[in-house]
Amino acid sequence: IMTKPVGAVCNLACDYCYYLEKANLYKENPKHVMSDELLEKFIDEYINSQTMPQVLFTWHGGETLMRPLSFYKKAMELQKKYARGRTIDNCIQTNGTLLTDEWCEFFRENNWLVGVSIDGPQEFHDEYRKNKMGKPSFVKVMQGINLLKKHGVEWNAMAVVNDFNAEYPLDFYNFFKEIDCHYIQFAPIVERIVSHQDGRHLASLAEGKEGALADFSVSPEQWGNFLCTIFDEWVKEDVGKFFIQIFDSTLANWMGEQPGVCTMAKHCGHAGVMEFNGDVYSCDHFVFPEYKLGNIYRQ
């Protein structure tokens, strides 16, 4: 289960973000803050439901670091309280702009894996990833990454592939090699625009092909050329040095193994998400009213 302690709240306003407008689903809860009561209930029940000796907690946003460090320290205390002999691991996704020495010390001391959202070199990243004032965010993200490296925190990158950066696959890939990022996840962005009465503008899957493709969407041809170009470069000299999730997952599928990524699995629905108020959905990309499964308090 991917847990969202701040819901859609974020200090950035990326043009392509599919999650910012989820705040419109919870207008009656303007703060979008997970309570200590819900945190404890979730940790207890989540650990108790596991059948394996290792339990992984995944913290996602919005921007996860908009909750104070004390929240995550509390979470770790509760994990220890309810561990029942299991090994607990944590990973957290962040845009990197709010990272400090204190945050990085906490992550290193407790062996958290940190995922950083960064869309390649500055020109590519700043095309769509801006703050709420419309200012670019690349410099602050790189400051955060350098802090992670300084403190020896294990980290990887999630990079959105859009209509702009998809045109420069080798520049894009070489950037991650230059900043010594050895684990990279590519996330192609494709959205349709449909206006809703509650203020949302992105179409759900239930709406099919209604609406026009958003301008930032990567085209099928762009995505294919992007992957093929990077693969040809990667396979020549970087196998075993740099790990690209989609290549590893494709190989795993080919070998009859578990791909490790839900989009390549035989069945959808193994990567659920819980919102700040306990609402549960089958997927981070299915947070729409019609796909709500229930609430941790009621179902």
Where are these regions (language model features)?
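Canonical Radical SAM [4Fe-4S] cluster-binding loop centered on the CxxxCxxC motif
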Residues: M2-E37
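Extended hydrophobic secondary-structure segments that form protein cores and membrane-embedded regions
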Residues: M2-K4, L56-G62, D89-T94, I244-I246
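Glycine- and acidic
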Residues: T3, K22-E28, F57-G61, D126-K130, ...
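Short cysteine clusters
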Residues: C10, C14-C17, C262, C268, ...
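Radical SAM/AdoMet-radical enzyme domain recognition
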Residues: L39, I43-T58, R67-L205
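Radical SAM enzyme [4Fe-4S]-AdoMet core and its adjacent flexible, acidic
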Residues: R129-V139, N146-T263, H267, V273-N277, ...
